[in-house]
């Protein structure tokens, strides 16, 4: 996380700390409306900025899988050297990111944590999207499997018209809603053990919604949370879904993309995250939820 982003979030947190919402139905409704305004993405956009004609994620995923690739270029950002594709089908054009890297290394150390086996995999993008949907977390752009130029990989819809979170004039109109999205991010990153979250893989769209991309270094086979101390405020919907999720549902969501050891460690991190939240509730009460 860059110094600029840290300063930005610190400023937003200060604003949030100064705001109180009435403990009334009207007050709660106002707060809910603010959050909905900041987090709803409406329609996905094409390269021309116009909404794409997809009524659901399933329709968009089918397009990503089957549309013709009419253009491709390298994306000069990131470790895995993804490609930007232009897809076209039935007169509809959309851009997408295609990742195809599959690298496994032994005995890797990152930020003080040792990984006996470390995998950098495009398949983790699909796992992150499917797990996010299972949690009710609308923060990971639709992603699916795809082949291009003989290479198997993942293809993810492009977030058009993004804002620069590190620009000096960046101001989220609803600081509470914006900061809550970063709390969702911390919860999710702990669950999937995402060791590579940085400003280049967080996208802010024009509605000030955060989109989380580039999860190729998540899901490492380590039965530990990433940084439990960062989980301090909890999205009740995500918490409820995680708590009610059984191991079969978890396995079904990610088994096409994770191996047995990675799934076992993910299940253990789920348990640790549940324990973390239960400890927070015991200490601070139901106020930890939003």
Q: What is each residue range found by the language model?
A:
Residues 52, 120-124, 194, 258, ...:
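Extracytoplasmic/periplasmic, Sec-exported soluble proteins
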Residues 166-170, 197-202, 223-224:
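A short secondary-structure junction signal
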Residues 1-10:
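Bacterial N-terminal signal peptides that target proteins for export
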Residues 65-173, 189-194, 206:
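Conserved ATP-binding subdomain of kinase catalytic cores across diverse folds
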Residues 85, 98, 181-218, 266:
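Active-site acidic catalytic loop and adjacent metal/ATP-binding pocket
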Residues 148-191, 231-233, 240-264, 271-272:
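ATP-dependent phospho-/nucleotidyl transfer catalytic cores
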Residues 9-95, 260-290:
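Regulatory N- and C-terminal appendages and interdomain linkers associated
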Residues 88, 117, 204-290:
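C-terminal catalytic region of ATP-dependent kinase domains
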